[in-house]
Amino acid sequence: MTQNTQLTIIGGGMAGSEAAWQAANLGVNVRLIEMRPKVETFAHRTGNLAEMVCSNSFRSDDSEQNAVGLLHWEMRAANSVIMHTADSHKLPAGGALAVDRDPFAEAVTAKLHAHPNIEITYGEVTDLPAAGPTIIATGPLTGSALADAIAREAGQDALAFFDAIAPIVYADSIDMDIAWRQSRYDKGDTLEEQQAYINCPLTRDQYEAFIDALLSADKTQFKDGETAGYFDGCLPIEVMAERGRETLRFGPMKPVGLTNPHDPQTKAYAVVQLRRDNALGTLYNIVGFQTKMTYGAQKQVFAMIPGLQEASFARLGGIHRNTFINSPTLLDDQMRLRSKPHIRFAGQITGVEGYVESASMGLLAGRMAAAEILGETLPDLPDTTAMGALVTHITGGADAKTFQPMNVNFGLFPPVEGLKGGRRGRKDRYKAYTDRAKAAWTNWLTPQTSLGGSQAAE
């Protein structure tokens, strides 16, 4: 291929936006196609690129003890537009990186529109391109026509599961005579970070009544032929409750690390947490409360939570279908479709789960495609890095027969020899993983600084 060859990227979510940015910064001309706002989806509200539709959290930012924090570090080192923009629109969230979602998406959109090597067009793509380097990053809400085309080419049905979306509450409707502000274990370097969450306490009787209401509430029904397979990291709360009455109390409603200033001598039996959803602090999402309850049921059930008895909702929860391909069967180690190697896949459609994981796969696909167009060969990506471990998992490390969406985690990394196992050795083990990864990532990335006369991120 030649440097004049254009790269087509279908889908302007986290992965597609990152792929476009990376390839364009390496000197490749990119055409980015996004179907919104011409074709809308259930979950999206705008036509912005990189719109966040579920949580507003990029999760832990700890690059020494957490695999997703390490992924943040690797992406920042590679001039990620998603990470740089997230850093510019961060919200207090203790040790996590939470983002003001609308200004974030608007900023990513503006940066990509302003890039001289990126052309953005809007409209639906309904078939696989017959030729030309292409990245498909259409995400969990891939249009039905394109999904059918992918399924025909793959020779198998696309796998499917369902994502649920958490509700968002107006802050001024929360009863702060009952609720209080505190991050778990007072995490954070500033008072604002240490008070990043609003907490609503429940007694045992209130918790039991809440569980009863969850289990009996009206739920959204699936269409004929659809079955409910859920990713464990985004389970609806009522599905968690069905797994056991105490499941929520040891999950999103765990009461640990919190002290109620209204009644410091009494330990709550369970706690519902809300996390700031915008910079103004006027909106809060209910952490871990993805749901498929009907809208009417949500209003009734959530009003049972002390502090939310008069809550007003900016958005109620919902459920949407999430499709992904069997990547270990269909993709090679360069993320190319084996049967049509001019096509790469990236993002959530490949079977990674999470905003950052999706964007990171876009980062890799964009760099791999750009190198190919420029006639260069990238060195093999070490599986000791977070991105290397993740792409190795989806392109062959996982069992194709049981393949399910995966967050990045240290279980995907090759072991570091000579380290103590078990809980007691965990801190040293994780630090060894991240030190090794950072060195390997730097070594892999450094030779690419001159690739195509690459440009720095804004």
Swiss-Prot record:
Q: Name one GO biological process term.
A: tRNA wobble uridine modification
**Enzyme Commission number, as recorded:** 2.1.1.74
Q: Origin, by domain of life?
A: Bacteria
Please tell me where this protein is predominantly located: cytoplasm
Report residues binding FAD: G11, G12, G13, M14, A15, G16
* Cofactor or coenzyme needed: FAD
What catalytic activity is recorded?
A: uridine(54) in tRNA + (6R)-5,10-methylene-5,6,7,8-tetrahydrofolate + NADH + H(+) = 5-methyluridine(54) in tRNA + (6S)-5,6,7,8-tetrahydrofolate + NAD(+); uridine(54) in tRNA + (6R)-5,10-methylene-5,6,7,8-tetrahydrofolate + NADPH + H(+) = 5-methyluridine(54) in tRNA + (6S)-5,6,7,8-tetrahydrofolate + NADP(+)
Quote the function comment for this protein: Catalyzes the folate-dependent formation of 5-methyl-uridine at position 54 (M-5-U54) in all tRNAs.
Q: What is this protein called?
A: Methylenetetrahydrofolate--tRNA-(uracil-5-)-methyltransferase TrmFO
